[in-house]
Structures are given as structure tokens and as C-alpha cells.
UniProtKB/Swiss-Prot annotation:
Physiological role: Minor structural protein that forms a portal-like structure at a unique three-fold axis of symmetry, following binding to the host receptor. The channel formed by VP2 may allow the delivery of the viral genome through the host endosomal membrane.
Localization of this protein: Virion; Host cytoplasm
Protein family (similarity comment): Belongs to the lagovirus VP2 protein family.
Ranges annotated as spanning the membrane: none
Disulphide linkage map: none
Annotated protein name in UniProt: Minor capsid protein VP2
Signal peptide start-end: none
Domain comment, as recorded: The N-terminus domain points away from the virion surface.
Naturally occurring in which organism (per UniProt): Rabbit hemorrhagic disease virus (strain V-351)
GO cellular component: host cell cytoplasm; viral capsid, decoration
């Protein structure tokens, strides 16, 4: 009878260990899912602030085989969206213009000292 009791206790401890590992794994997966969802929400929020349609943003980020060629279309053109877009778009915020003017002001000299510009 004592032998059966020790087996029962051993099986109980082994089962508790497996259950504990399963719970830890489940908790880890929940945290990973939560982090992924937070990242997706943040990305969707950023694109939404730029004026993109939230449904299109969701389809692009999550993606599925039915909508592989979804294109983002700008929903509105108010001042806050335009200003936010200018921050992210180098073509419209003057950086390219500044680089071009810098390049135009820089003279390139060859080894004999003659300007090639």
C-alpha cells in the first residue's frame, strides 16, 4: 500500500510540473501576443494620424491572401495631417531642396586644382 501511495505522490508531482510548465508557456504566449498587438495598434495609429483609412491600414498590416494588393489612400487633407505628413516625407519638408542647394554650393576640384563645376 505504501508503494502505491509513493507512486501516486510521484505522479502528482510530475503532473504539477507539467501543468506549471504549460501555464508558464501559456502566459509567455499571451505576453507575446499582447506585445504584437500593441505594436500593430501603434503602427496603425501612426498611419491613421497621417490620414490613412484605418480599415486599409489594418488590411495592410495584418494582411491576408484576399487583399494582397491593398493600396493606402489618403482620407483627408486637413492641416494636421499635412503637417504630420511633412515631417515624415523628405520630398515635401525641404530636406531634398537643402541637399540640392548644398551640392550646388560645393565645388569639386580635380588634382590640378581646376574646378569641375
Amino acid at each position: 500500500m505504501a508503494f502505491l501511495m509513493s507512486e501516486f505522490i510521484g505522479l502528482g508531482l510530475a503532473g504539477a510540473g507539467v501543468l506549471s510548465n504549460a501555464l508558464l508557456r501559456r502566459q509567455e504566449l499571451q505576453l507575446q501576443k499582447q506585445a504584437l498587438e500593441n505594436g500593430l495598434v501603434l503602427k496603425a495609429d501612426q498611419l491613421g494620424r497621417l490620414g490613412f483609412n484605418p480599415n486599409e491600414v489594418k488590411n495592410v498590416i495584418v494582411g491576408n491572401s484576399f487583399s494582397s494588393n491593398v493600396r493606402l489612400s489618403n482620407m483627408h487633407n486637413d492641416a494636421s495631417v499635412v503637417n504630420a505628413y511633412n515631417v515624415y516625407n523628405p520630398a515635401s519638408n525641404g530636406i531634398r531642396k537643402k541637399i540640392k542647394s548644398l551640392n550646388n554650393s560645393v565645388k569639386i576640384y580635380n588634382t590640378t586644382g581646376e574646378s569641375s563645376v
